[in-house]
Amino acid sequence: MEDLKSIIRNIPDFPKKGILFKDITTLLGDAKSFQRMVDLLSHRYVGQKIDKVVGVEARGFIIGAALAYKLGAGIVLVRKPGKLPSKTRSKTYDLEYGTDTLEIHTDAFNKGDRVLIADDLLATGGTMAAVVDLISSMDVELVECCFMAELEFLEGGKKLPEGKVFSLLKF
């Protein structure tokens, strides 16, 4: 895994001073590394009968679509308000300074679907906790929340269901 971790570029003071940003675009842009990352993540879920993979806006779409393809599952998009064309349900959640809202189509799942939620990076866990809450009343089974990378020192996994978090790369 160290080889994949080393491809991710560090950008100091982005998006604000004091933050060391993990820029995953370097890994995504390297074909062999991207393929390896998708293969390693998808291997964990082979045989688990995943019906739908939820991709969280925006980089979660990349990870989610690749996993859905590899697993023979459908892809469901969770987006910012006003971006989905049909009837939606929404979840507003707290940020460090203010709030944000996510939406999902009300007809995104079939009853009993086994769902994998995918995103690029687990940091504070606020966004993923909102996604878990958003789908929790939609009569589906949450298999796991998976991430390409996790910033462990931020302890975002503590906001998510115990035993339902997997991160391929940990920083």
UniProtKB/Swiss-Prot annotation:
Its main location: cytoplasm. One of its GO terms (molecular function) is AMP binding. Homodimer. This is Adenine phosphoribosyltransferase. CDD domains: PRTases_typeI. It catalyses: AMP + diphosphate = 5-phospho-alpha-D-ribose 1-diphosphate + adenine. Keywords: Cytoplasm, Glycosyltransferase, Purine salvage, Transferase. GO terms for cellular component: cytoplasm. It comes from Citrifermentans bemidjiense (strain ATCC BAA-1014 / DSM 16622 / JCM 12645 / Bem) (Geobacter bemidjiensis). Its EC number is 2.4.2.7. GO terms for biological process: adenine salvage; AMP salvage; purine ribonucleoside salvage. Pathway: Purine metabolism; AMP biosynthesis via salvage pathway; AMP from adenine: step 1/1. Belongs to the purine/pyrimidine phosphoribosyltransferase family. PANTHER family: ADENINE PHOSPHORIBOSYLTRANSFERASE. Catalyzes a salvage reaction resulting in the formation of AMP, that is energically less costly than de novo synthesis. It is found in: Cytoplasm. InterPro entries: Ade_phspho_trans, PRibTrfase_dom, PRTase-like, UPRTase/APRTase. NCBIfam families: apt, PRK02304.1-3, PRK02304.1-5.
